[in-house]
Amino acid sequence: VAKAILVTGATGQIGSDLVKELSKRYEGTQIIASSRKAQSSTESESLVHEVLDVTDSQRLQEIIECYGVDTIYHLAGILSAKGERDRELCWNVNINGLKNVLEAARTCHLKVFCPSSIAVFGANTPKFKTPQTTIKEPSTIYGITKATGELLCQYYADRFGVDVRSLRLPGIISYGTPTGGGTTDFAVEIFYRAIAEGSYTCFVRSETRLPMMYMPDAIEAILKLMQAELSAIKVRSSYNIAAVSFSAAELVAEIHKHLPNFTCNYQPDFRQAIADSWPSVIDDSQARTDWGWQHSYDLPAIVTDMLEHLSPKLAKGINRQGGRETPGAGEQGRICI
């Protein structure tokens, strides 16, 4: 069990839920939740908040030494759609930030989780049952940073023995935080609009099929990977991971079962080309074999749970604009793609 855990990007989509779960599972372990901006949320004896820009290696080292950190969940990153609008920022945060974490892990003997993404795959990648080892050739700067990040992880593991572990995450669906500039944001935004307005304009075509995962499964996958014995980890770049794949139209149809008056129209934008370059179904058999990965939520279960949690939230007037009342909040930690 880790003595002190640092979570970068802790206010983001996955980071915020991961911090909660780490606090539950590892009672008594010091959790340091870091983000670029000071947080007003409640601290406790075992949970503290620190301001950290992951491109600042000196500040990172200060936090590691101050708390005696031995494990880092490195979730800070810039997403696909936002990355296309600011390529320099995307490269700086996603590459230099990761390199700083890996260097700290090398010198301080830390264990690291670093997420990758299905965005590492490109137009020449097999779209159906994409294998663990295959052509990548990403078409976005975000995907390029993630593919480069995988090579960095492999290098630090092979060259220096750093225990770094990674997952190629699909689109992540959750209700806890605002969307943050990803190509799969439609699969979250649609729930807010369905409940609050009864209609939604989707930015990908109806037949667009992408791999998705519900947040509880994503958190479980991350923690299960980190709990596995080192001898079980056969992939040192990043594991394929999957749960369910569905099209935008199939998601709409499932929501219709609960909200029959809901309507959806489709106006594809620049994100359509990004989605078209990604796989539709991922082969994650190696993760299931090596360390026992299995998902729990299918599409009907995801839709039911999302509506059950968001309906009372929106009834109180919270996040009526699909979470966009606080645009950009915690974007550095958002890794849903």
Language model regions located:
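N-terminal Rossmann NAD(P)H-binding glycine-rich loop of SDR-like oxidoreductase domains
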Residues: 3-25
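Rossmann-fold cofactor-recognition segment
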Residues: 45-56
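NAD(P)H-binding glycine-rich loop region in Rossmannoid oxidoreductase-like domains
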Residues: 54-93
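Conserved Rossmann-fold NAD(P)-dependent oxidoreductase catalytic core, especially the SDR/UDP-sugar
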Residues: 74, 99-141
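Short alpha-helical oligomerization interface
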Residues: 82-97, 130-138
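Active-site helix of classical SDR
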Residues: 145
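NAD(P)-dependent short-chain dehydrogenase/reductase
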Residues: 154-209, 215-220
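C-terminal substrate-binding subdomain of Rossmann-fold SDR/epimerase-dehydratase oxidoreductases
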Residues: 203-205, 211-319
